[in-house]
Amino acid sequence: MGFLQPGHTRPRICCPACCHARCKACGERGERGAVHRACNFKRRTAAVHHRTRPAVLQQYRPAPVESEAWRKAPPSSDRCKNARIFHHGPAGTVEYWSIFGEKKGALRASGSVRALTSTPRGYVVATDQGLWRVRTDTLNSTPDKTQAGKTAKQHQAPVPVRISTQRSCVALFATENMLIALFADGAVRAYDADGENELFSLTLPCTFSSAAQCRVQGDEIVLSDTARAITLSAGGALKWNISLYETPFTPLITTDGLVVSAGGWVLNAYRAETRLIDHTPIYNRDSYFHVLGSSRRAHVQEAPPSRPAAPAKRSPYDSIFSSDPFFSSPAPAKNSGKTDNAQETHTTSPPGPYATPELLLQAVQTSLKEGNVGPREPAYARSLHALLTSPHHARARAPAVTSARRAQAATLLGALGAHEYRDALLELLKEQDYTVLEGILKGLTRCTFGLDERALLALYRVTRAKDARAESLMRAACDALAACARSAPRTLSEKAVSELSRISTGAFPYTIRAYARTLVQSMLR
C-alpha cells in the first residue's frame, strides 16, 4: 500500500505496518497503491504502531466502532460540541470520546444500558438499576511516563451519581434547559439541564416504548409514541392526550398542533383546537331581578328622567337564548298600575333575528352550506340543543315545533362537527319518537365517532330493538354504522361491519337487507 506523500495536506493511504513516510524495515518510499514485500512488520503488530501515531493523523481516523450496537447521542448544547458519547447496550459499557478519536473516559454499568443522552456537563445513563448522572467536565488528565519514555495521558474514571431508582426508563431526551425521562409504566420525570434537580414528575394513563419521541415547542412539551400523542405544559400539567391507531410508525406532531399517523393504508390527521363556547359582554347598566311566580321584571333603580338609559348593544358572540323571543320569556302586557310598596316598570325583550323555528333552522342550514358559521357556532349549538331537549317549553313558546323540525335540528347539530355535540346526541337516543330518532342518527352520521364504543353501543340498542323495523329508521342506522366503519379505529370498524352484515342477513324487510348489503359491498370495493 502507499505511504503518506509529502506536500499533501490530506494524508493518503499509509502502510499498515507503520505510519511514517518511510518504512522502518526497508527505508524505501513507495508509491500509492504499491505493496512493500520487504516490510517485516506484520498486520497483528500494526495496532501497536498506530497507538503512537501523530495527532495530525488522528483527526482522519474514523471513530472506533466495535459492533453495530453502538449508538451515538449528539450533544445538547454548545459547551459539549467537542465530544461525542457512544454506548454499547448489551455489554453495559459507556465510553466518552472526543471528535478527534481520543478516549475521554469509560464507565462500566451494572446491567444493560437502556438509554443515554448527553448533557452540557456530561451525560445521563439509564440502566437496569436506575438513572445515573456522570460529570465529565471535572475529569483531570495526569501525565504518565511509559517504558519507552513517551508521555501518555491517564484519565480519571468518572463517578456516576444515581438520580432515580426507577428501573424502567426507555427513553431520555435533553433540551437546552431540561432533561426528560420516559418510563415504560407511563411515568414522566423532568430534571434541569444537568440532571441534578427534579422539576416535576407525573404518571400518564399510557405506556412508553423505546420508539418514543419528545419535542419542546415554546412553553409546551410534546410527546409521541406508537399510537399515542401527548402535550404537557412547562410545569408538567397534562393538556392533551389522544390515542391513535396501532401503527409501527411514530406519530408526527407539527408546530400548529397537527398529529399525523399511519394506520394500514389510511393516513389520519388530528388537530387540537380551542372552541369559543361563550362570550358575554358586561355593560354598565341598571340591575334587574325576576319576581318569583311572574315573568315580569322589576327595576331596582329607575334611570333619571333627564337621562334615559341607552339600549344595550348586541354582540355577534351573544347566545341566541338571551335575545331570541323564541327562547326567552314572552313580553308582558303593559300595565301602569302600582303595587302597595313599589312601582313596577315592565320592559319588553328586544326583537330577535329568529322569531320562529323555521327561521332558526334555515339560518343554520344556510351558514353550513356557505361555510361561514364562524363565531355563531356556540349560539347555533345551544339553540338547536334547546329545541331538542326542551320540546314542551318550546311548544309553549312556539306551537310550530314539530317532530320533523326537532329531527332537522338534530341533523344540523351533528353537522356542526364538534366532539361534544356527539355526546349530546348520544344522550338523546332514548327518544321514543321515530322521526326525532331518525334525525339523531343522521346527526351521528355527520359527526365524529371518537375512539370509544359509546356510539357503537348506542347504535346496537337501536338496531337490535324489538320494534326496530321502520325502513327509514333502519336506513339511518345503517348509514351511521357505515360512517363508523369508515372513520372509527380498526376494532370499532370491524364491529360496525359485522353489524351491517348481520342486518343484511337478519330478519329484516328485503329493502333494509338489500340496503345494508349495498353498503358492505361499497366498503369492500
UniProtKB/Swiss-Prot annotation:
* Organism name: Treponema pallidum (strain Nichols)
Query: Superkingdom of the source?
Result: Bacteria
Q: What is this protein called?
A: Uncharacterized protein TP_0487
In this chain, composition skew of type Polar residues spans 139-149, 336-349
Q: Where is this region: Disordered?
A: 139-158, 330-356
The record ties this protein, via InterPro entries, to: ARM-like, Quinoprotein_ADH-like_sf
